[in-house]
């Protein structure tokens, strides 16, 4: 399997062979969905909390006697129906994390990478290096590649100049190749990778590296 490599001017300079184990996997929608949901769930802190009637400050004394006042019966001030009372059935701290087997996580990554390639949403450039931070230069490269936003750019070793050149462009996100994940790839229409990033991904997510 071969894929064209572009330069900064958007011209094809060569073709490289890529691993079918990583970029030629049939798309499994159920698996990708499960991996995406697990990643989103694992990102939740689960620390939101409310106080019950047993935790709010205040007396537990009955406000007035049960009968003879003409008013509706009422207990403590900490009742959920009273102002400043406790919260009934409010959120409590909980663990939202979901376990996903390692083989399933790895296969889901391969599925999305293969889908990006098959649908024409993956482009490979020879390199993305800048002598100084220049947002204009990065914007020119993306325009030459004719990529559609939102765009995810993955490089093997991002430096400060590269990060600063891309961070002010709307709908453009950068990431190290070894941190590619389901959520970022699905949330961004286009995936741009350097040639070295492709090799790093093949080494990391290939069938032989477990």
UniProtKB/Swiss-Prot annotation:
List cellular component terms (GO): ribonucleoprotein complex; ribosome
> What is an example of a Pfam family matching this protein?
Ribosomal_L4
Which segments show compositional bias classed as Polar residues?
41-51
What keywords is this UniProt entry annotated with? Ribonucleoprotein, Ribosomal protein, RNA-binding, rRNA-binding
Instruction: Tell me the GO BP annotations in alphabetical order.
Output: translation
Disulphide linkage map = none
Listed InterPro entries: Ribosomal_uL4, Ribosomal_uL4-like, Ribosomal_uL4_dom_sf
Tree of life domain: Bacteria
Transmembrane stretches in the record are none
Q: What does this protein do?
A: One of the primary rRNA binding proteins, this protein initially binds near the 5'-end of the 23S rRNA. It is important during the early stages of 50S assembly. It makes multiple contacts with different domains of the 23S rRNA in the assembled 50S subunit and ribosome. Forms part of the polypeptide exit tunnel.
Query: How does it associate, per the subunit comment?
Result: Part of the 50S ribosomal subunit.
Protein's name according to its UniProt entry? Large ribosomal subunit protein uL4
Underlying gene: rplD
């Amino acid at each position: 399997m071969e894929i064209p490599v572009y330069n900064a001017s958007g011209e094809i300079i060569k073709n490289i062979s890529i691993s079918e184990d990583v970029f030629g996997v049939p798309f499994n929608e159920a698996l990708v969905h499960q991996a995406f949901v697990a990643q989103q769930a694992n990102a939740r802190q689960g620390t939101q909390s409310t106080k019950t009637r047993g935790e709010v400050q205040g007396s537990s004394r009955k406000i007035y006697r049960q009968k003879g006042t003409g008013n509706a019966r009422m207990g403590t001030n900490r009742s959920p129906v009273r102002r400043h009372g406790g919260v009934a059935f409010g959120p409590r701290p909980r663990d939202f994390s979901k376990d996903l087997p390692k083989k399933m996580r790895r296969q889901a990554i391969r599925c999305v990478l293969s889908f990006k390639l098959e649908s024409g949403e993956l482009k490979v450039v020879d390199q993305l290096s800048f002598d100084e931070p220049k947002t204009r230069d990065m914007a020119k490269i993306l325009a030459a590649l004719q990529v559609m936003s939102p765009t995810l750019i993955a490089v093997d070793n991002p430096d400060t100049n590269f990060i600063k050149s891309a961070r002010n462009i709307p709908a453009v996100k950068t990431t190290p190749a070894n941190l590619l994940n389901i959520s970022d790839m699905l949330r961004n229409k286009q995936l741009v990778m350097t040639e070295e990033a492709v090799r790093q991904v093949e080494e990391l997510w290939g069938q032989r590296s477990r």
